[in-house]
Amino acid sequence: MSIMKSKIAKTLVVVVVAIAIFTLVLLMLWEGPLGTLTEENLTELNGEVPFRFKDSGSNEEGKDVTLSKFFVCLNKVLRSADDSLSSYLCCGETSEEEGESKKGKYVKNAITEARNMMFRVKDSKDVILEILKKGDKNRNELAETVSNAFSAVETSEGSDQESEGADEQGKIEKLNTALAELYIWIWLKGIPEEDKRTLQFRKTYKENQSVKNLLDGLDEENREVAESTILVKVGKKEDSMHVIEHILTSIFQANGYMEKGSIKQAYLSAKASVAAAGGSLGKKVSEVSDNEGKGLIDSLFGMIGWRNNSNNNSSVSKKKEEQGVNS
């Protein structure tokens, strides 16, 4: 009889331990609306590095966009972003071309990385604050890092060597991290200039099926927030836009710096080609003006709007203007 009681007691202990472990796992896997952030974290962040958005004041009573509502909606949107949406946010249209498909994968991974940084790591508030301060210290650093990282990925693609393949993967991971940091910076603080592509995106994004699917997939409360209006600093003014518009436009703008990375490589090739062909009155490559290559590439790719240059047809001796994200 005592042996039977002993077996029952041991069985009960095992069951209790199993239930405790299972409950602990569930608690670890469960993610609140704000993830590892708290409302206090948001208030502290906004106090240290003021965000570029606020409630518009034109939403219905009781439906104003608080910091908590915005971040919860952002978390849901990032979690719901699929490959199709990532591709659209990369090039502004659905593209089956291999190059755009690869960029779409980088964007999808970067969106996931940004969500991890903001809502899933233990010290998410500190991670966000570090990114915001980095952007404040040097407004161009985050954008230039994306451009350089993408250029590095481009030059390493197509390698068959195992060691070089591992190096390529490392460069892709750096690109994903750089993009994720730029997303966070533009969502919360950075103010990039709006070019024609951005304005066109803002006018047409609602018509895209991937965006429609995203909104349809949100719960009622977060869809309501996504379609509420906020005031966002754009250039030297504040512009009224929907929350979802701000979130998606910021990703689209950040992705544009991958294009700049591509142009940078093409531009270098153009300079070499001009010199090799005896162009520029026989100048050496080192003597070819920056604006000569830039004008050629801008014409080929239609990317004049990405550059903060109002005199593309001016003298070739004019200094090349710096580009980057304004704060």
Swiss-Prot record:
Transmembrane helix in keyword set: yes
Region (Disordered) residue ranges read 149-170
Feature: compositional bias, Acidic residues: 157-167
Name-wise, this protein is: Uncharacterized membrane protein ECU05_0140
Coiled coil regions, renumbered to chain: 162-227
Q: Which residues cross the membrane?
A: 12-32
UniProt keywords, alphabetically: Coiled coil, Membrane, Transmembrane, Transmembrane helix
An annotated GO cellular component = membrane
Top-level lineage group: Eukaryota
Q: Where in the cell is it found?
A: Membrane
Describe its membrane topology. Answer: Single-pass membrane protein
